[in-house]
């Protein structure tokens, strides 16, 4: 639930390496 400061409209979350995932076009962590 914490924004990772990254969007995932066109590309996947690079921050997924630290546990972030795409929700509503924005990368979130927990």
Curated annotation (Swiss-Prot):
There is a cross-link at residues 1-30 (Cyclopeptide (Gly-Asn)). It holds the Pfam family Cyclotide. Expressed in leaves, petals, petioles, roots and runners (at protein level). One of its GO terms (biological process) is defense response. Keywords: Cytolysis, Disulfide bond, Hemolysis, Knottin, Plant defense. InterPro entries: Cyclotide, Cyclotide_bracelet_CS, Cyclotide_sf. Probably participates in a plant defense mechanism. Has strong cytotoxic activity against a variety of drug-resistant and drug-sensitive human tumor cell lines, and against primary chronic lymphocytic leukemia and ovarian carcinoma cells. Has weaker cytotoxic activity against normal lymphocytes. Has hemolytic activity. This is a cyclic peptide. The lineage of its organism: Eukaryota, Viridiplantae, Streptophyta, Embryophyta, Tracheophyta. Belongs to the cyclotide family. Bracelet subfamily. This is Cycloviolacin-O2. Disulfide bonds join 4-20, 8-22, 13-27. The presence of a 'disulfide through disulfide knot' structurally defines this protein as a knottin.
């Amino acid at each position: 639930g914490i924004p990772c400061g990254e969007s995932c409209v066109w590309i996947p979350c690079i921050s997924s390496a630290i546990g972030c995932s795409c929700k509503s076009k924005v990368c979130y962590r927990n």
